[in-house]
Amino acid sequence: MIVYCDTSWFLSYLTEDDENHVIAREAAEKLAGHDFVVCEIHLLELPAAVRAATHRTQDPVPEHIARRVINRFDRAVTGKILLRKEVDMKDSVAMARSLGETHGWKERHTTFDLWHLAAAWSLSAGTFLTFDQRQGKIAGLMGMSN
């Protein structure tokens, strides 16, 4: 089974100080043996999100921790612990836009939230891991467990 994780889930998984770290680790252990995948969206968003967190006015992430998280992520991709899969850009953007049209009028969803859902669907993910309940609800409607 393919497991697709939202970027914020990966950040919790990779950061010991994160409030959801233990929950993320336990979820990953339950899914051991399945294929955890990443795509271009993760490769773009995760480093940018971590760097942005160093500039927060409240509880900024220290730069050395941010660099460690990015390095751990890169090593997991390079070492094939996280399997890199390509997503068709045109199709994933169209799907994300459709999801926004369907769900974005009822609740707030960011571009990346919708794009991750579209990518997971295009990669035939059976599980979508996220801490965002709104995103998880849509994943469930799309047939993915979470």
Residue ranges and their predicted role:
Residues 1-45, 50-66, 133:
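Short, well-structured N-terminal submotif of metal-dependent ribonuclease cores
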Residues 27-37, 76-86, 129:
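Generic detector of contiguous secondary-structure segments
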